[in-house]
């Protein structure tokens, strides 16, 4: 009788160049267990020829390299990787090591929470000049805490197959507590309009009950 193959506790997917209009250089880690965790990841970047780039520093915009982002049971955590140092523009592959895992008591989301850029009419926008606020949605039957960051990207690359890299990140000072099945809007100061191109978020150990 053939033994049933057990799935790995975590799956990792790295996408250097997105084909769906989303951010480049994204990492998705999926939790196949029944326990929510705070993973700490380590990264080794490589170029398109498979050569390691030892002078490149790799961090996650959502803090996955620091063990700050919550990976819920049965759910996924998406992080955007930022590369700095000599050869940063050459990264096309990343080897990921799970350095540490801290278990945490947190329910598994039924549906993913969302964060979007919005204009003055509270409609979703991809135009940084119309980026007046952040719309947040929690469709789940329990409260969550979200940590939100604004992302500024480098200029569009000259070659279509090259990734558009993260240039700078600003994480909002206060985390946002969202009640079950609720939404919220965070209005931004006028002087940041036009400076950022994307908004990202991750779940954080809950402060909301």
Which residues are covered by each model-predicted region?
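N-terminal "mature head" segments of proteins
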Residues: 1-25
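Terminal connector regions
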Residues: 2, 72, 78-131, 189-209
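Short, solvent-exposed loop/turn segments enriched in Ser/Thr/Gly
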Residues: 19-26, 38, 124-133
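Asparagine-centered strand-capping/turn motif at beta-strand->loop junctions
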Residues: 28-35, 47, 134-142
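Hydrophobic beta-strand positions in extracellular immunoglobulin-like domains
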Residues: 29, 45, 83, 136, ...
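Short, hydrophobic/aromatic beta-strand segments
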Residues: 36-42, 54-57, 144-150, 159-162
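Solvent-exposed strand-loop boundary residues in beta-sheet-rich modules
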Residues: 47-51, 102, 154-156
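Intrinsically disordered, low-complexity Pro/Gly/Ser/Thr-rich segments with frequent PxxP/GP/PP motifs
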Residues: 51-89, 161-196
């Amino acid at each position: 009788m053939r033994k049933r193959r057990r799935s790995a506790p975590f799956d990792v997917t790295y996408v250097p160049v997105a084909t769906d209009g989303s951010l480049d250089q994204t990492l998705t880690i999926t939790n196949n267990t029944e326990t929510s965790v705070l993973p700490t990841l380590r990264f080794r970047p490589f170029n398109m020829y498979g050569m390691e780039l030892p002078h490149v520093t790799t961090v996650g915009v959502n803090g996955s390299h620091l063990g700050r982002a919550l990976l819920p049971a049965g759910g996924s955590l998406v992080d955007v990787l930022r590369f700095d140092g000599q050869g940063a523009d050459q990264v096309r592959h990343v080897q990921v090591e799970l350095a540490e895992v801290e278990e945490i008591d947190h329910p598994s989301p039924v549906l993913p929470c969302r964060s979007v850029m919005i204009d003055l009419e509270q409609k979703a926008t991809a135009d940084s000049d119309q980026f007046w606020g952040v719309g947040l949605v929690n469709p789940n039957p329990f409260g969550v805490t979200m940590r939100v960051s604004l992302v500024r990207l480098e200029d569009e690359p000259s070659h279509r197959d090259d990734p558009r890299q993260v240039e700078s990140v600003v994480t909002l000072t206060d985390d946002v507590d969202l009640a079950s099945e609720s939404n919220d809007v965070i209005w931004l100061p006028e002087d940041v309009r036009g400076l950022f191109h994307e908004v990202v978020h991750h779940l954080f150990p809950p402060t909301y009950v």
